[in-house]
């Protein structure tokens, strides 16, 4: 049995802690034979291989008496880069418990568990459902809406340095002014409506007018300014910080994809430039 979970890009503009999209990088968990103790085989750096691995901790949180197994973990989702690496593991852990424990969890139940563990639904929701998911959590009441993201390209600049979510959150203010809150709310409304209509020009306008988080976090990602400038000059819809950063995401049409990649490559920035596609499916299980 193999469990596959996509990467995600969240905090899309003013969709702070609320809106995320599934993208074409993946965590894969191969479930092998039962064992006397949990073993997670992988080649990742500084990640436990025993029961303390987040994958196993999550699975045991869902069902504490699961029989230990030998597992193989593969992932091309970079760690601490704002592409949902921890969320993918949490979602995989929930699915691992669901499969080994024969729990028959609904998608809604998976989302509730994942949100409780992660603290917010913006990454875990698209990892579960796929595509674009708009979510809200108010006093533990979770609502989510799955919609189709308009056809487009996501060009990711993935820096060679990490930016921990905790560090990125520490630069955020404790409060927003009433004026900024109203402005951000209205911009978020326009962004959602334009995405639903397939109007990426207006959506891009709204994405770049977030007041919730990006203006505080941009100084932590020195490459952001020049990437936005070059991408805008070459016809991108929007440039935004993916998740808590440091990945910088450029949203553009398929036609503009290669010209933008070519121009960004000329900058010789300290990181990788990768074109990602929208993943329409969330977590899935392949039986052998």
From Swiss-Prot:
> Where is it located?
Cytoplasm
Q: Name one GO cellular component term.
A: cytoplasm
Q: Which reaction(s) does the protein catalyse, per the Swiss-Prot or TrEMBL entry?
A: L-homoserine + ATP = O-phospho-L-homoserine + ADP + H(+)
GO BP, sorted A to Z: threonine biosynthetic process
The family database entries (InterPro entries) matched by this protein are listed as: GHMP_kinase_C_dom, GHMP_kinase_C_sf, GHMP_kinase_N_dom, GHMP_knse_ATP-bd_CS, Homoserine_kinase, Ribosomal_Su5_D2-typ_SF, Ribsml_uS5_D2-typ_fold_subgr
Q: Where does ATP bind?
A: 78-88
The alphabetized UniProt keywords are: Amino-acid biosynthesis, ATP-binding, Cytoplasm, Kinase, Nucleotide-binding, Threonine biosynthesis, Transferase
Enzyme Commission code: 2.7.1.39
Q: Identify the pathway.
A: Amino-acid biosynthesis; L-threonine biosynthesis; L-threonine from L-aspartate: step 4/5
Any Pfam family matching the protein: GHMP_kinases_N
Q: Enumerate the GO terms in the molecular function aspect.
A: ATP binding; homoserine kinase activity
As for what it does, the entry says: Catalyzes the ATP-dependent phosphorylation of L-homoserine to L-homoserine phosphate.
UniProt record similarity statement:
Belongs to the GHMP kinase family. Homoserine kinase subfamily.
In its UniProt entry, what is this protein called?
A: Homoserine kinase
């Amino acid at each position: 049995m193999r469990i596959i979970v996509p990467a995600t890009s969240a905090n899309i503009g003013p969709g702070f802690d609320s809106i995320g999209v599934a993208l074409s990088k993946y965590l894969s968990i191969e479930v092998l034979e039962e064992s006397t103790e949990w073993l997670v085989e992988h080649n990742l750096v500084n990640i436990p291989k025993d029961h303390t691995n987040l994958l196993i901790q999550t699975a045991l949180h869902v069902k504490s008496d699961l029989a230990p197994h030998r597992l193989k973990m593969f992932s091309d989702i970079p760690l601490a880069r704002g592409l949902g690496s921890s969320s993918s593991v949490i979602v995989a852990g929930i699915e691992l418990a669901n499969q080994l424990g024969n729990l028959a969890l609904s998608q809604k139940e998976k989302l509730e568990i994942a949100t409780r563990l992660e603290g917010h639904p913006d990454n875990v929701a698209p990892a579960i459902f796929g595509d674009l998911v708009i979510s809200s959590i108010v006093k533990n009441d979770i609502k989510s809406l799955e919609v189709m993201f308009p056809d487009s390209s996501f060009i990711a600049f993935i820096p060679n340095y990490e930016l921990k979510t905790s560090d990125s959150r520490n630069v955020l203010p404790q409060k927003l002014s009433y004026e900024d809150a109203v402005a951000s709310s209205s911009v978020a409304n326009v962004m959602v409506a334009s995405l639903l209509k397939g109007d990426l020009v207006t959506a891009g306008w709204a994405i770049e007018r977030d007041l919730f988080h990006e203006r505080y976090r941009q100084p932590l990602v020195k490459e952001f300014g020049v990437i936005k400038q070059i991408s805008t000059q070459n016809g991108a819809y929007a440039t935004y910080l993916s998740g808590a950063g440091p990945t910088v995401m450029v949203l553009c049409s398929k036609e503009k994809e290669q010209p933008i990649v070519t121009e960004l490559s000329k900058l010789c920035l300290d990181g990788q430039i990768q074109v990602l596609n929208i993943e329409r499916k969330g977590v899935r299980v392949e039986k052998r």
